Amino acid sequence: MADTVAGVRTFAVLLPLTVIGQMITAVMRVDEKVQIQANLMTVSAIIAICWLALSTFVLKFGVMGAGVYYGLSIGIWAIGIFWFIGGKKSQLQISPADLKLDFAICGQIFKIGFPFFLVQGATFIFNTVANSLLGSLGGDMGSLYIAAFGVINGYILYITMMVAQCFSYGLQPIAAFNAGAKAWARLKETLSCTLKYQVVTLALVTVALWLAATPVCAFFAGSDPALVEVAANATRTVILAVALGYLAMTMSMYFQAVEKVGVATFTGLLRYVICSVPLMYLLGNMMGVEGVWIALVVADAITGIISIALAAHESKRLATL
């Protein structure tokens, strides 16, 4: 417990840097300095991984070393702030006058960013419900199913989510720029291309993960054969429709960019809460643990269909402008 507390406190010290780092990289995307952002993130990842290996295997720092690792992996991004201070490297220069709070701007930031905040809360609800159902429906094997969900949600689905984020984070600044410039044809083309390439890419990733489910789960789950078997079997079910499910995240990011907060909030909650939670309860009580896994597939499919419908409606709207 003391080791864990030390790790949490260490990360808390570095938390301000991680917040600044996330903000800076987001602004870099808007400023179209994607290569600089990518270089900064790559360097931070290399440094953080090297530190994790050193602190774990050589220095034996335990959880405290992991706290520093998490802080470094994102906190180093904060160095990017110097891109916006002094000189003419960017049009978005920060001056002392900008440090004064403008509550009107703060309100606008809160309004546009609120959907993303709700998505984070939605994932908490989603994880809580899934763990609770797997534990209760799994009986004596409940802890094994919870561990399997941890592997799937923490690693397998995280991999697919990172792929989806590449598209959604790339779409957002371009969509915001084109919307501001009233370049509706470019905005429509950008949205269409992003969704098409995202579905195709995630479909290929899904096939790869489905075929390699056992070795991938073994890599993350360790040497427990029972856990690997349960996680691999569940993975082959859960990932079947993620190529559709993550369309909601991209559409939410798009609607945030064009300042349609209501629809952005709806699509942000669609996969994790609106579809997944009721279906997990319904199919879980009907089919047991297998019903929970199947519920995630059905939720992804429904989420994808709704997202495609919203994208089609938005494309028609843009065509009339």
Residue ranges with predicted function:
Residues 10-30, 37-48, 66-82, 168, ...:
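Short runs within selected transmembrane alpha-helices of multi-pass transporters and secretion channels
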Residues 26, 53, 116, 173, ...:
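Small-residue-mediated transmembrane helix hinge/kink sites in multi-pass secondary transporters
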Residues 21-37, 146-213, 246-267:
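Small-residue-rich hydrophobic transmembrane alpha-helices
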Residues 50-54, 132, 277-282:
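A gly/Pro-rich, aromatic-decorated transmembrane alpha-helix motif that marks the paired
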Residues 14-18, 111-177, 198-205, 235-249, ...:
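Transmembrane helix-bundle signature of multi-pass secondary active exporters and lipid flippases
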Residues 1-14, 54-114, 175-241, 282-321:
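Short alpha-helical transmembrane segments in multi-pass integral membrane proteins
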